[in-house]
Amino acid sequence: MIGVIDYGMGNLFSVSKALERVGVPYVVSDRPEELEKADAFILPGVGSFSDAMDNLRRAKLDQFIHRMVDEGKLLLGICLGMQLIFEESTENGSAKGLGLLAGKAVRLKDRDAEGNKLKVPHMGWNRLTFHQTSPLLSEAEEGFVYFVHSYYIDGMEDGDLLASAEYGVRVPAVVGKRNVFGAQFHPEKSGTAGMAILTQFTKMAAEQQVKK
């Protein structure tokens, strides 16, 4: 079963519908005692980084996430949820994240290297470029996926970068280290390429459960 972490800022409907299409059981909750029954977790999110962290802390979901990751359960952060798994964000000054991966969220540049103007927030389809092999990407292709964001991860460890896209800068699109993963785009809104990644995440969770 997949636990979808509800902290008041997630795109819960589209993630839930995507999991229904995959055909896996799931629970959506803001209560650790309900979520801990799950085999793996999805941390969705839209909105302000600092508000999101405040909500997680208020519900003690930050502590819960750390405990589940320490126990070896899989975590997938989506969009803002991916940014939250890193150390900090420069949005509205500075805000501390969950610190599961090294790096920080910084605002996208509004000009590319040639000085051409770019729209921020970035909303649209961009092609993935894979950098490393990973079980999460084993059934996916370097197709187009759908982004909606104003911030991207900078200063991360090269070994944690699984796939990127280009939007003025190299945007980390899929990240992963041990049992912690993130997707800056919305896999649940990204057609075949996105659903392949989401489906594989659920398969990884099922395989991990069988091994126990």
Curated annotation (Swiss-Prot):
Reaction catalysed by this enzyme: 5-[(5-phospho-1-deoxy-D-ribulos-1-ylimino)methylamino]-1-(5-phospho-beta-D-ribosyl)imidazole-4-carboxamide + L-glutamine = D-erythro-1-(imidazol-4-yl)glycerol 3-phosphate + 5-amino-1-(5-phospho-beta-D-ribosyl)imidazole-4-carboxamide + L-glutamate + H(+); L-glutamine + H2O = L-glutamate + NH4(+)
Keywords: Amino-acid biosynthesis, Cytoplasm, Glutamine amidotransferase, Histidine biosynthesis, Hydrolase, Lyase
GO biological process: L-histidine biosynthetic process
HAMAP family (alphabetical): HisH (MF_00278)
Protein name (Swiss-Prot/TrEMBL): Imidazole glycerol phosphate synthase subunit HisH
EC number: 4.3.2.10, 3.5.1.2
Task performed by this protein: IGPS catalyzes the conversion of PRFAR and glutamine to IGP, AICAR and glutamate. The HisH subunit catalyzes the hydrolysis of glutamine to glutamate and ammonia as part of the synthesis of IGP and AICAR. The resulting ammonia molecule is channeled to the active site of HisF.
Subunit structure: Heterodimer of HisH and HisF.
Cellular localisation: Cytoplasm
Superkingdom, natural source: Bacteria
Pathway: Amino-acid biosynthesis; L-histidine biosynthesis; L-histidine from 5-phospho-alpha-D-ribose 1-diphosphate: step 5/9
SUPFAM superfamilies membership: Class I glutamine amidotransferase-like
Transmembrane segments: none
Active site: C79, H186, E188
GO molecular function: glutaminase activity; imidazoleglycerol-phosphate synthase activity; lyase activity
Lineage: Bacteria, Bacillati, Bacillota, Bacilli, Bacillales
Gene3D superfamilies documented for this protein: 3.40.50.880
Pfam family, one: GATase
Residue ranges of domain Glutamine amidotransferase type-1 in the record: 1-211
GO (cellular component) term, any one: cytoplasm
